[in-house]
Structure formats: C-alpha cells, structure tokens
C-alpha cells in the first residue's frame, strides 16, 4: 500500500495493547498505520499490562481528556507472599512470606476494605511527576520521594478466582487508581505481602471489550488500504456521550462554528457543558457551554477537515 506522508483522519481506535510495549510505542505503531497527522492516547498502560487503550486521531485528540478522566475496568492477578521492588513481577523480590490460610469469609472481609472510596499512596514506579521528572526515574536511582495520599473510588471489586497464593480480581475504578498499589495493600492486609502478576484493562468509559482489536489485526487490515482502516474508527463524539445532546438549526451551526454565541434550544443549568450537532446533518460540532439562555463555544471541531 502506497502511503502519503501524513493525512487528516479523525476518530477513536480501540487497541488491545500487547504486553511489552509502552503506551506511546503502541500509539506510534497505530499512528503510522493510519498515517494520522495528529494522535494521542488516553491514559498510559504499563508495558506489563495488556488491554484497552483508546487512541485518539486528529480532531478526536481535543476530547482525549474525557477518556483519561473516565472510569476504567481491569482484570488483575495478584501474587501473594512476595514483595518486589516495583510492585509487579518485573521487580526484584524483596521479601518472601508464607500465605495465611483464608476462609472465604475472612478474605471477603479484607477485600471489602478496598471497596468504595479509599486512599492510596502512588507507587514510586509510576509516571506521576515530581519537579518535572516521573517518579520511576527517581526510583531507578534509589531515591524515594514523599507522596501524598490520594482518594480514589473503587465502584466494584469482585473476586473472580483464587488459589493458595493468587487472587484474580475484577476491578472497576476511578481515574488515578493504581491497581498495583491495591495488590500491594491487599498483601499487607493479609500480612504476607504481594505484587501484581498480570493486569488487563477490560474497558474504558464504557467502551465494549469486543470492539477493541490487536496490533496484528490492524496491521492485516492496513494491507487493504485506508478505507478498510477507517471503517474501524469510532466517532469522536462517543468520548463525550455523558454530556447532554443539543441540536442547532443551520443558521446557529454556522454562527457557532465561527465562534459566536447562539440561543440555546434547551434549558439547562448555567455553565453546563453540552455536545452539539447540526440539526439537519447530525454532524458533531463539538462542545458548548450554557450561559443563561445561550450557548457559547467551548471546544469545537474543525469542520473543514474532520472526516467523521
């Protein structure tokens, strides 16, 4: 397939990230397949992790923050009895302890302490920044930085299965939750230590897992040309479906796309954000913000260029 240098292509790709690649490496692989002029991911997955990584192409990058802020769901296997330097299986083993015998009731009591709103201390091996540098860079130098506790919400935590020394959990959580820290903290609650053996992101922002594809699948489709690839793009407005929908008549659409405030066809609370569409074509225009009886431009797409 002969490829142009870069092209204007807009939409969201649901990638099933393979193990061993950083999120940025995976993004660049997909970006090159699409030859997309602009691209960005929506929240990093560690190289050890697999699963859903929504990638925003073109104008969709304007809405990537909403996917970054969205709830996420994971399937994780926690190895009990061993603490590691990194909190996952790639680190050096620091301690080994015997795993206590647990009844279903005693285990459930411990797991219940990790449901709802909880506090976490972010791990040193994380991309969280301190004075402009990610924490993992300090950790690799043996430097420990004091981190503040963070409140996160675990909306669901289900025990899927267990063995004598592993727990497999299905976890749905808010933005900023470190599953690795949950694994380590469960190990401490059990008194034996633990680390993350595997991590798979099932979904982000309610996107269905059956809609994501592997790199190999995208590479095979790329052999058929851009039209085949573009058929697997998800429209960018799905990133902001949680906002109320507003349809504008043609005259207001034109004014809005020129950056002008227009009358609001709906009554919503002041400063509410809405997703806007042209009434006739149902074309997504971007986001607006309610100002009294009007809507002002908030985050608009470039209608002269976008393809979805």
From Swiss-Prot:
Pfam families: TruB-C_2, TruB_C_2, TruB_N. It comes from the Bacteria. Keywords: Isomerase, tRNA processing. The active site is at residue 46. GO terms for biological process: mRNA pseudouridine synthesis; tRNA pseudouridine synthesis. Transmembrane segments: none annotated. HAMAP family: TruB_bact (MF_01080). This is tRNA pseudouridine synthase B.
